[in-house]
Amino acid sequence: MQADPTAHLPQPQRDRLKHIELRLRFLGEVRRPDLIQRFGIQSAAASRDLALYKELAPENVDYESRGKRYLLGARFSPLFAVPSAQVLSWLTEQLGDATAPSSEALLPCLMPSRLSHPGLDTLACITRAIHMGQVLSIDYHSVSSGESSREIVPFALLDTGLRWHVRAFDRKSQTFRDFVLTRISKPTPKLGDEAARHERPEQDVQWTRIVELDLVPHPDQPHPEVTHMDYEMPGGVLRLKLRAAMAGYALRKWNVDCSPGHSLRGPEYRLWLKDHLALYSVETAVLAPGYPSNKGCAT
């Protein structure tokens, strides 16, 4: 196993070098102000860290003098091993970029782990495309239609609680849709190809539309006051505002009975959607438990 070339460095500096590499690999670029803002260091210290990273991994980074930024090198090879879960938490919450997760928790705590994780190389190509506004050529593997080649314009990651998706405009179907990250292979940026106006996220009606959902204790529950306590329901109603593109995933994750007559049975259905018409024309409503619709956006 190759020795860690940063092992002799102080931990704070190793953390900054790791941050440089994360930005290069998953955003495609890093600038001196990124380090200054993230770590509260002086400009001179940020310059030294960037110079040191380039010295340790010269193939990983190219300097663009015009934009005063460091870009991902064509022969990039990571210095740091990072789990995909840690990368995703950093991308979505700015957490976990400094140190590896501790093997010892402060308190005993158990949580279900994900059964699947996206490959880091695929994830990196997609996140760079999102950050830089690139068009991607991909091979996509669908449960219903098998493998196909597509061009997509990605703009956001979606965590459904079970797996990760990328929201993108699909040039093959000429629609906005969700693609499961683990089903994407051979992602390649189409350099010089820019997104047309109708392919941009502000044109995605399901993305820009916000739906307001009122959830109440399921009428079949003998003790609704317990649900009031669990979900901190003022007035017995939990009001949510969600993007239409995310609504169906969220309702499925929370096992919300979305049938008009609260007809679903079982202890898992603690909540009921008070007005199922709130999901009218929401494409992901097909995923909502009990919702009376046969239309959806299966990918």
Language model segments and positions:
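Bulky hydrophobic/aromatic content
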Residues: 72-141, 253, 260-264, 268-273, ...
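Polybasic (Lys/Arg-rich)
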Residues: 208-299
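A generic structural signal for beta-strand entry/edge sites
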Residues: 67-69, 163, 237
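Short, basic/aromatic recognition patches that contact phosphate-bearing ligands
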Residues: 1-82, 215, 264-299
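Conserved short hydrophobic interaction patches
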Residues: 53-56, 187, 253-257
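Core beta-strand-centered patch of the WYL/Sm-like small regulatory domain
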Residues: 104-105, 109-229
